């Protein structure tokens, strides 16, 4: 037994910041101080506060160190681990307070979180099955195989109110019930780990931090619907997640928790990985299954739905990583426990990848019904620089932008749809007053155009026509009639596209038109971008009262658009200016501004 455990984040974010070097140095320094028998080092999954990595927590006291560098390790070992003195300069300091905070659970970022899907992330070594078992892992599978009938498992999920965490929010128990009712010689369980939304990394972090939870849930699903084979479709761009899944599958087979006659129950179930190439459309369930089959990842018309004809034309259920991660806890704690969290129609918790113009970025897991204001102002620590909140974008390219007037709306599936957005997989991007909403709509539409598989004409052609109109607007070349044309195209796409990619592609455009129409009008009528983002509508000018005639801006300008002699007020020639902004960045006197 160790007297202290040092947990170091080994997720993708902290690994890219050098956490493996920190672990190596930590083990070396601990050995040098003769503490190898007293202090254990554990590489965990993601803690959540990704912007503060590399992150380290020392237990049993729970001291939370952020932005740790390799050179800090000797001091941490000598002072904290040897002498018991906290290294205060490395403690986390919240933006709303001046005091440094020692325990992680006292930070505003964690106070309002309730971890179910992320319960083991940042807590256990994801590459050690015994640590997972030590936290109650595979208990749910044992209960199911020894005490429950398949229909009992499905009823538990129905009673819990669990809805799919990958987008539409379809009741998980109902999906399983449909698949179980269809007779077939083979059925399949698929896990969608093809997380494609820009800025979303919830599923990746669960796979990196708690892969066995997903394997256990898939085995439970196999028992419930009568399947013996599972597939995890994970993108190849997630090398750490892939590696840990491979380790977890091998360990589960070794322990008899995957394979033949699990728990001597006569139940057989195994899991294989399939690596995706990163196509966004392969997040759509029928396209994902087509890709697993070895064909080009294109959606198929529905019906028939996968519960009847899915993978290899056999009954199939497909859930995403976060959905599966909830299931073992529901089995162990009971459906009433899960249903006690959340709102009337949206039970449990939801993991969000919080990003954008916010002080605390990273993963947050909150009960359904938490307001956007609580996320932004308390968990997220507010907007940097004291700037105003303008909008939040949820649901990735399929979602919409939520304005400040809806900050107090409880977040759940139905409320988000009612205000023109959607839950999606859980991306949550915060925008401040310097964000152009027309440019945001254009950004997501550019993504959709690139990721469209091209199978159906409305999506293939319609998204391109919409993008062309948005480009005209951001360049000041549009007319008011273009807005009517844009809305008409949006409505056509929503009703005639083959799959959800095309059907939801108009959402960012429609939501910004609904709440920020005046910005579109300013671009079209006034030929101005109120946020100062759209390059073609910007005009750089020099304030004669502030200009010192230092010539630094003129020497920086790549287009020789700035004229003026030494110690004389300079001017910008708008005909030659390429609007790169280099002069504004270089000016030391704040004399250059844009309008």
Language model features with spans:
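Iron-sulfur cluster-binding cysteine motifs and their immediate structural context
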Residues: 52-56, 458-464, 552-571, 582-595
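Ferredoxin-type iron-sulfur electron-transfer modules in oxidoreductases and energy-metabolism complexes
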Residues: 2-5, 19-43, 60-89, 140-157, ...
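Conserved phosphate/anionic-ligand binding catalytic regions in large, soluble enzymes, centered on
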Residues: 14, 137, 157-179, 278-290, ...
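Hydrophobic alpha-helical positions that pack around
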Residues: 112-113, 242-368, 380
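C-terminal accessory/binding modules appended to enzymatic or scaffolding proteins
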Residues: 348-360, 366, 372, 530-578, ...
């Amino acid at each position: 037994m160790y007297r202290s455990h040092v947990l170091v984040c080994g997720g993708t974010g902290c690994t890219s910041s050098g956490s493996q070097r920190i672990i190596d140095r930590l083990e070396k320094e601990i050995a040098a101080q003769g503490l190898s028998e007293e202090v254990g080092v554990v590489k965990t999954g993601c803690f959540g506060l990704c912007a503060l990595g590399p992150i380290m927590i020392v237990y049993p006291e729970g001291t939370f160190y952020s932005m740790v560098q390799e050179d800090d390790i000797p001091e941490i070992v000598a002072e904290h681990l040897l002498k018991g003195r906290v290294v205060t300069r490395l403690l986390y300091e919240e933006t709303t307070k001046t005091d440094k905070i020692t325990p992680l659970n006292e930070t505003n970022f964690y106070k309002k979180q309730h971890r179910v899907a992320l319960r083991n992330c940042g807590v256990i070594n994801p590459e050690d099955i015994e640590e997972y078992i030590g936290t109650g892992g595979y208990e749910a599978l044992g209960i199911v195989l020894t005490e429950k009938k398949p229909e009992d498992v499905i009823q538990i999920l129905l009673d819990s109110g669990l809805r799919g965490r990958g987008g539409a929010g379809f009741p998980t128990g109902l999906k399983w019930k449909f698949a179980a009712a269809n007779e077939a010689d083979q059925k399949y369980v698929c896990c969608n780990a093809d997380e494609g939304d820009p800025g979303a990394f919830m599923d990746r972090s669960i796979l990196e931090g708690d892969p066995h939870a997903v394997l256990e849930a898939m085995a439970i699903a196999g028992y419930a619907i009568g399947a013996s084979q599972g597939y995890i479709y994970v993108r190849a761009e997630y090398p750490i997640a892939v590696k840990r899944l491979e380790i977890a599958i091998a360990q589960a087979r070794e322990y008899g928790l995957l394979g033949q006659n699990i728990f001597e129950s006569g139940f057989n179930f195994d899991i294989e990985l399939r690596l995706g190439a990163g196509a966004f459309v392969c997040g759509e369930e029928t396209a994902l299954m087509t890709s697993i089959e070895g064909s080009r990842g294109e959606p198929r018309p529905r019906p028939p739905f996968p519960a009847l004809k899915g993978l290899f034309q056999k009954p199939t259920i497909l859930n995403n990583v976060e959905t599966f991660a909830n299931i073992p806890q529901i089995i162990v704690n009971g459906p009433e426990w899960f249903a006690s969290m959340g709102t009337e129609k949206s039970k449990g918790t939801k993991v969000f990848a919080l990003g954008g113009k916010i002080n605390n970025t990273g993963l947050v897991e909150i009960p359904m019904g938490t307001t956007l204001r609580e996320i932004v102002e308390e968990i997220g620590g507010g907007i940097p620089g004291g700037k105003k909140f303008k909008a939040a974008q949820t649901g990735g390219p399929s979602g919409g932008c939520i304005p400040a007037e809806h900050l107090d709306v409880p977040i759940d599936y139905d409320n988000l749809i009612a205000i023109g957005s959607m839950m999606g997989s859980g991306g949550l991007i915060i925008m401040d007053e310097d964000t152009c909403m027309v440019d945001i709509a254009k950004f997501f539409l550019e993504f959709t155009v690139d990721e469209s598989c091209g199978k159906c004409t409305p999506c293939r052609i319609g998204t391109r026509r919409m993008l062309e109109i948005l480009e005209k607007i951001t360049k000041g070349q549009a007319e008011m009639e273009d807005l009517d044309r844009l809305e008409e195209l949006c409505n056509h796409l929503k009703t005639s596209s083959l799959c959800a990619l095309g059907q939801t592609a108009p959402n960012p455009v429609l939501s910004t038109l609904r709440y920020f129409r005046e910005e579109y009008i300013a671009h079209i009528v006034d030929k101005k971008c109120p946020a100062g983002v759209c390059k073609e509508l910007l005009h750089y000018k020099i304030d004669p009262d502030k200009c010192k005639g230092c010539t630094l801006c003129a020497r920086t300008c790549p287009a020789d658009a700035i004229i003026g002699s030494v110690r004389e007020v300079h001017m910008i020639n708008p005909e030659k200016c390429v609007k790169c902004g280099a002069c504004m960045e270089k000016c030391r006197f704040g004399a250059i501004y844009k309008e």
